């Protein structure tokens, strides 16, 4: 369960980075 939460957090962080690059 913790692994799933960690993976989701990492994916969310990557998604934010991609979104930031797209916004820039």
Swiss-Prot record:
Keyword Lyase: no
Kinase found in the keyword field: no
Localization per Swiss-Prot or TrEMBL: Periplasm
Record key words, sorted: Iron, Periplasm
Descriptive protein name: Iron-regulated 31 kDa protein
Function: May be involved in iron uptake.
Induction context: By iron deprivation.
Organism for this UniProt entry: Haemophilus influenzae
Any one cellular-component term (Gene Ontology): periplasmic space
């Amino acid at each position: 369960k913790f692994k799933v939460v960690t993976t989701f957090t990492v994916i969310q962080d990557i998604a934010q980075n991609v979104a930031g690059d797209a916004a820039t």
